[in-house]
Amino acid sequence: MKSAVNFELPLAVKIRKQIVQALNDFNMIEDGDKVMVCVSGGKDSSVLLALLTEIQRRSERKFQIEAAILDQKQPGFDVSKFKVWVESLGVPFHIVEKDTYSIVKEKVQGGTFCSLCSRLRRAILYDFAHANGFTKLALGHHRDDVVHTALLNMFYVGTTAAMPPKLKSDDERNILVRPLCYVSERDIEELAAEWAFPVIPCNLCGSQDGLKRQRIKKLVRDLEKEIPNIYASIQTSMTNIKPSQLMDQDLWDFKNLKT
């Protein structure tokens, strides 16, 4: 089946170049890699998957791409149309089935599901990737996610931390990469609308109101009206750390500072 994705759209070209920049800056994908793109059926990971296939076609590096989605057995989860779209890209597609929906609904009552759901989902996908010989896991987090996470940690946790572009998983068996780390959510939304691929809604987290991440997003979007480059500025600050100007004594020896 031929893909209906138009890779020559100006916005597709822009995002592809931003992905390539991230791949090069952080050495995300190397010759011989077997990359598992973790797709959710949403706009972010789907745009990533499609553009990685185009980058693969153009690249001198030889690497494999496959997609994997977790069927968590939540009501209304129908992967059939999305599966057809993924296969139209020429990408092998894995549906990993595990009922985490029942676990989350049972364990979390009266709160938000995201934290537990994410931990369970990660563990299952890490196991699948390791068992099937994948060398990299590509995640669909974009620039806005990185910025929102930094502020969430600062406001609610008291740490200066965000989403790194490349890291070793907690179980130390997998390398995770975030090729969309330079790409804005608005650009992804616009391209997804142009391509009009099938989207699988999340009836678990998508049904919750008042999430902290949503509050942070609204805050930054409101500030963006006064500070147009706020997302780029916050992200750039993460590449320009000055330990002597902070308060972490593990990074800077304040006690022994003398003239």
Curated annotation (Swiss-Prot):
Keywords, ordered alphabetically: 4Fe-4S, ATP-binding, Cytoplasm, Iron, Iron-sulfur, Magnesium, Metal-binding, Nucleotide-binding, RNA-binding, Transferase, tRNA processing, tRNA-binding
Which cellular compartments is it found in?
A: Cytoplasm
Question: Which Pfam families does the record cross-reference, listed alphabetically?
Answer: ATP_bind_3
Q: Which GO terms describe its cellular component?
A: cytoplasm
User: Under which main EC class is this enzyme filed?
Assistant: transferase
As annotated in the record, motif PP-loop motif runs over 40-45
Principal location = cytoplasm
* Cofactor(s) named in the record: Mg(2+); [4Fe-4S] cluster
A GO molecular-function term, please?
tRNA binding
What's a single GO BP term from this record? tRNA modification
Catalytic activity entry: cytidine(32) in tRNA + S-sulfanyl-L-cysteinyl-[cysteine desulfurase] + AH2 + ATP = 2-thiocytidine(32) in tRNA + L-cysteinyl-[cysteine desulfurase] + A + AMP + diphosphate + H(+)
Instruction: State the family named in the UniProt similarity comment for this chain.
Output: Belongs to the TtcA family.
Q: What's the miscellaneous note? A: The thiolation reaction likely consists of two steps: a first activation step by ATP to form an adenylated intermediate of the target base of tRNA, and a second nucleophilic substitution step of the sulfur (S) atom supplied by the hydrosulfide attached to the Fe-S cluster.
What's the subunit arrangement here? Homodimer.
What is the name attached to this protein's record? Answer: tRNA-cytidine(32) 2-sulfurtransferase
| Primary gene name | ttcA
